[in-house]
Amino acid sequence: MELRQQIPTGCIKQFGQFGVPYVVGEVAEFLPDGDVLVNITLLQSGEKDIYRLSHLLEDPEAE
């Protein structure tokens, strides 16, 4: 399955088991290595950032 089709837009995930929660946004950029950069918003601060989809898919849903 293509990485782009796996983006859980609107889902709330967290960085690892004890990390900060974030909301998954839309595609920011397609990378030459086949990965995708995705916009995210940190829930606690409202800060916006980008994150590799391949890493995002390994993060758990926030508790």
UniProtKB/Swiss-Prot annotation:
Q: Which domain of life is it from?
A: Bacteria
This chain belongs to the protein called Uncharacterized protein HI_0451
Gene source species: Haemophilus influenzae (strain ATCC 51907 / DSM 11121 / KW20 / Rd)
| Upper classification of the organism | Bacteria, Pseudomonadati, Pseudomonadota, Gammaproteobacteria, Pasteurellales
